């Protein structure tokens, strides 16, 4: 254990592990995940840095990793070094202003979703008018596909759209922990919750820099005369 443990805590999102940015060019998906978990383990043992996940997010991540063929050994490391903890939903308080903003944003997004739907209806009607009496199923399918994509963008991107996202923020607030994610919606709301946040792509480098600094000479170990006491 480090002589001066940092005692930092981080709550990790699924997007951290799925980001291509955490992997080296010559690494496979599994190798990148394993290297990240080994770094998390070293930070836990040497720096007392703890990483957490709500069980809901952990289950989601494990399912994705299994689908991508990640070995049980690597999944075992995930279970060992990332602590699963349920957020205390009854004791963690959220400022009323945050709730008001969420309501306003959802109301705005519903209106945007309606506009997207209206646009799709008009587009479908135009396709019908252009029809020469033949089958226009492919045109309708295209309209529906575009509608789904646009509707998802209007309502879901940049917003908390699942219980898992909310669990992550509540747990981070409870633990006074930093949030590690690539999800822009979570990043935005982490700021409103008064939480530290870090892009997932930067997290491995952060831990590695901490570990390197642990073995480097420390200015605060020198005596009043500027001489390193270990060299006397």
UniProtKB/Swiss-Prot annotation:
Query: What keywords were assigned to this record?
Result: Endonuclease, Hydrolase, Nuclease, tRNA processing
Give the matching InterPro entries: RNA_free_RNase_P
Q: What GO molecular function terms would the record report?
A: ribonuclease P activity
Cysteines engaged in disulfide bonds, as pairs = none
Family under the similarity heading? Belongs to the HARP family.
> What further note is attached to this protein's record?
The ease to obtain knockout of this gene and the lack of growth phenotypes upon gene deletion suggests that archaeal HARPs do not make a major contribution to global tRNA 5'-end maturation in archaea, but may well exert a specialised, yet unknown function in (t)RNA metabolism.
Protein name (Swiss-Prot/TrEMBL): RNA-free ribonuclease P
């Amino acid at each position: 254990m480090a002589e001066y443990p940092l005692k930092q805590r981080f709550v990790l999102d699924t997007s951290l592990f799925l980001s291509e940015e955490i992997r080296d060019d010559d690494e496979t998906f599994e190798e990148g995940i394993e290297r990240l978990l080994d770094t998390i383990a070293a930070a836990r043992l040497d720096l007392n840095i703890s990483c957490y996940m709500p069980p809901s997010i952990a289950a989601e991540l494990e399912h994705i990793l299994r689908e991508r063929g990640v070995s049980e050994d690597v999944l075992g490391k995930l279970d060992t070094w990332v602590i699963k903890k349920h957020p205390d939903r009854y004791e963690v308080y959220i400022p009323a202003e945050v709730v008001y903003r969420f309501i306003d944003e959802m109301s705005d997004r519903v209106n945007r979703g309606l506009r997207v739907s209206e646009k799709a209806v008009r587009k479908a009607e135009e396709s019908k008018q252009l029809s020469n009496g033949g089958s226009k199923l492919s045109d309708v399918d295209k309209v529906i596909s575009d509608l789904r994509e646009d509707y998802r963008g209007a309502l879901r991107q940049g917003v908390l759209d699942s219980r898992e996202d909310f669990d992550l923020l509540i747990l981070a607030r409870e633990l006074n922990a930093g949030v590690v994610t690539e999800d822009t919606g979570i990043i935005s709301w982490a700021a409103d919750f008064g939480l530290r946040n870090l892009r997932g792509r930067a997290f491995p480098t952060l831990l590695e820099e901490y570990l390197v600094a642990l073995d480097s000479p420390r200015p605060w170990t020198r005596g009043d005369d500027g001489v390193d006491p270990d060299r006397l």
